[in-house]
Amino acid sequence: MATTKPYRVLLYYMYTTIENPEEFAAEHLEFCNSLELKGRILVAKEGINGTCSGTVEQTEKYMEAMNNDPRFDGIVFKIDEADGHAFKKMHVRPRPELVTLRLEDDINPHEITGKYLEPKDFYEAMKQEDTVIIDARNDYEFDLGHFKGAIKPDIESFRELPDWIRENKEVLEGKKILTYCTGGIRCEKFSGWLVREGYEDVSQLHGGIVTYGKDPEVQGELWDGQCYVFDERIAVPVNQKEHVIVGKDHFTGEPCERYVNCSNPECNKKILCSEENEAKYLRACSHECRVSPRNRYVIQHELTEEQVAAALEQIEAGK
């Protein structure tokens, strides 16, 4: 690929057997640090799930090493160009699961998973009338961007998805089911779970939203908004043909694509809000969070009690 920016962000996963995740994680962290990469990599007995950033040279060395390891034969790297690192630190952590579903009887994607659809086939399938599109991500990811007509499960974490499906099965019965997520890893298990639950026509977007947005044929069409990513960038564009903002400011409902975390560390909820409203509402999602003694916005900006009281009074006056 033609390189125009000095850094890259890699996104990848692979379901493969890693005998000793703890030992592998420690060695892999050392290796990543030697390359001066930064990122977040999860390792489990069932495989690896990672995203990391570095210079073109550093990421090339990393991909070469991974490709030379027989355990990762065939691994696919999704590559974004960047002006700098997308992470502050490098973490490699062992986990019981790569994606947290916590099923009593786990899904092995090598044994059972939904049909893979390439971007063009997924695009065509979305336009069919008897199709249901399920977003397999969390609610705050959906709120920033999603496929047109996709169903938003009312969940805050991936492990809540099976229960939501069981409670809303009438929406899916007799339909062709399409499911998608950021890079594809969640759908490997989720689509397999749907098949095991008895749904007969289940397909997943191969490579996820990130691959769909880069596809030269579909060019991200039928996607509205941006794609939430778990690094310093927060959001990346998908639709190359038109940019429709679907995110709404938490306080005013105006179009917004800027995420912040609630300033109350005990809440930490992700909210969409403008810089202006961040200052006006002390970056807090509610009155309770605004008056929290641990409000990070108040502490960071060294606001006095009088200044906080004035801000609260202004909010009250504006209601």
Curated annotation (Swiss-Prot):
Keywords: Oxidoreductase, tRNA processing. The keyword Oxidoreductase applies. It catalyses: uridine(34) in tRNA + AH2 + O2 = 5-hydroxyuridine(34) in tRNA + A + H2O. InterPro entries: Rhodanese-like_dom, Rhodanese-like_dom_sf, Rhodanese_C, TrhO, TRHO_N. It comes from the Bacteria. The active site is at C181 (cysteine persulfide intermediate). One of its GO terms (molecular function) is oxidoreductase activity, acting on paired donors, with incorporation or reduction of molecular oxygen. Its EC number is 1.14.-.-. Residues 127-221 form the Rhodanese domain. One of its GO terms (biological process) is tRNA modification. SUPFAM superfamilies: Rhodanese/Cell cycle control phosphatase (SSF52821). Catalyzes oxygen-dependent 5-hydroxyuridine (ho5U) modification at position 34 in tRNAs. NCBIfam families: PRK00142.1-3 (NF001135). Belongs to the TrhO family. This is tRNA uridine(34) hydroxylase. The gene is trhO.
